[in-house]
């Protein structure tokens, strides 16, 4: 038995989960928030307890030190060396990383070079790797990429209709994201349906503050909604998703909001989506509350959000030539029952239908009516478990 920790490092946060492997038992989990800010918050959950402390954490290395010390303080481990492996979520692996990889040689430098493809994510992911390397230099460190699952896409799906030189020289293509989540829920869907994954055609919908939809055939990603970066695809909490590219030069010419590449990235990544249209919030709970109060902008934002998701599901029904199941996962997909109902009701012609008695808050499993030809499933994602499994597989 070994102890493996799965890490998801954000720019100001560090989410973690400690496993006993190969039993896949969660020993503890937690979240460190507001790294680099005053009054950082560290939360540790274990044995039915939740312990929280507020302190100032300047950087990721200090955050990791506090995490490890908390594990000892709460008698979850006796010493640092009980942890024999650490796995890190990394958003962008480009064409260079086609699978999870042990951190050695120039691996970390390559991860940082790929920050161009995920500027909001890869730098923070790399900071988490460096922090653990500094404090636990001798354990196996593994990077697990959101993009790896999508390397099975055919060229017709991942290439853009731009001059070929931009692909060959600049690697401009669709990479996708959330691959670890899509891979996990596809496998769980096969178990739930009682059929081999190799026999299934699935449309997996990872809908959280960020969101992506993937067409999965025989366990392989054949197309996905996110593109060159996690900005592409469906409308999201603060991201536009797909828009007409000509909007950008137009706004550069006629407004003062788009003067630099940083301006463009800020507006498209942080100020758009549900937040931009509603002028209220990027959180679906806030949007639904505003809709209930009759707020027009929130209602429009919600309708646009559902519309873009329906269109992508329809697109992937065409790509797959039908589907056995549509799977909802992540924060919104798992918890917003009215959202699931509204998405499916608009595409019922394809043979999918939700049973309102099954489609309730907190439900998991099959929420379809008995007569539905395409099953509708709700499956909680577990990206951390996939990461822990990959660490165990790659340990020397």
Swiss-Prot record:
Molecular functions per Gene Ontology: acetate kinase activity; ATP binding; magnesium ion binding
Binding site for ATP: 15, 206-210, 283-285, 331-335
Catalytic class of the enzyme: transferase
Highest taxon, organism lineage: Bacteria
Pathway per the UniProt entry: Metabolic intermediate biosynthesis; acetyl-CoA biosynthesis; acetyl-CoA from acetate: step 1/2
HAMAP family listed in its UniProt record: Acetate_kinase
Protein name as it appears in the record: Acetate kinase
Gene encoding the protein: ackA
